[in-house]
Amino acid sequence: MFLPTLNKTFKFLTLSAGLFLSSNWAQANEFYNHPNYFAFKQKAMTTYGLSSEQIDAAMSGARNLPNILNIMTRPGESKPWYQYRSMFLVEGTIQRGVRFKNEYEDVLNRAEQQYGVPKAVILGILGVETGYGANKGSFITRDALATLAFGYPRRADYFSDELAALISWTYKEGYPTNSIVGSYAGAIGYPQFMPSNIQKLGVDYDGNGHIDLRNSAADAIGSIANYLAQYGWERDRPIGFPARYSGNNPDSIIAKDLTQPTPYGELKRLGITPVNPLVKIDDLDLVNVIQLQDQFGSIYYITYPNFQVITTYNKSRMYATAVWLLGTEVASR
C-alpha cells in the first residue's frame, strides 16, 4: 500500500508544481489569457517540437507594447527618391561602411566567392538596414512580436509564426528569449533578419557553432549572401545601368512586375537606352525599367533580375536602388 500511495503523492505534487508554475507564468505573461494564445502554442508545438512548458517559460514576463501598434497603423509617408536617397547616401554612412569593409574584407571576399553575391551588395544591405550595425533596434523582440501576433489582426498569423520561430531559435542557441532586441517589427541584428529567416537562411560564418546576427558581423555577411543566393542571385551578372528615355509615354516602358522582365530589344525600340554609350546590352537580355523621381524630374534605370532579388529583402524599388548605389560607393573606396 505504501508505494502506490507514494506514487499518487508524487504525481499530485508534480501536478501541483506544474500548476503553480503555469499560474506564475500566466500572471507574468500579458498574453496568456488572449483567446488566440492556446492556438499559438499548439501550432508552435507542432511546428518546432516545443513543449507547452517551454513556450510558457519563454513568454513569462511578456508585455504588450501599444506604441508598436501605433507605429504599424500610422499612415506611411511616401518620399520621392531624392529625399529617400539622402537618408542613406550620405558621407557619414559611407565612411562607416568603408571602415566596416576594411575590417571584414576577408569575410566579404569569402562570401562573394562562395555565394556569388558581390560584396558591394552585402555592404549596401548592411548600410541601409542598420548603418553597419549602428542601429539594430531597441525593442525586446519577443514583446514586439507578441504585441503584433495578438494585437494586429491584419498580419496576426505572420507575426505569430515569427514569435514561434523566435522561441525555437533562442532555445536552440541557448539565448534567453527576452534577451533579444531588434526592430519594432521583430527584425534582428546587423541584417535585420526575421526569426524564421534566421532559422532557414542564417549561417554560422565565423565557425563558433552559433548563428548570432546581433554580434557577429561575419555571420551577418554570410547570412545575407546565402539569403540572396537562395532567392536566385545570378553570379557575375549586372544589377542594372542608369538609362535615358527618349519617348513620351513612360508608362509603356515602366515595369509593373519585376518578376516578368522584357527582352531589352523591345524596350530599346520604345526609346530606352543606357546613359553610358559604352554599355552594351544584348537585345535578348531580360530586363526591367524602373522610374524614380529626382529633384529635376524622372530618372530611369535598366535593371536585371538581380535587382529584383534585392527587392525580396524589401519590396521597395527605392530600397533596392539605395542598396545598390550605397554598396557600390562603399566598395569603390
List PLM regions with ranges.
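An acidic, Gly/Ser/Thr/Pro-rich helix-cap/linker signature
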Residues: N29-E103, N109-E112
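Solvent-exposed loop/turn segments at secondary-structure junctions
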Residues: R63, E129-G133, A187, S246, ...
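Bacterial N-terminal signal peptides
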Residues: K11-S22
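Flexible, glycine-rich surface segments
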Residues: T177, V181-Q295
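Sec/Tat signal peptide C-region and signal peptidase I cleavage site
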Residues: N24-A28
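Acidic/His-rich structured neighborhood in mature extracellular/periplasmic domains
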Residues: S86-S223, A229
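Bacterial N-terminal signal peptides that target proteins for export
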Residues: F2-L13
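C-terminal functional modules
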Residues: L284-R333
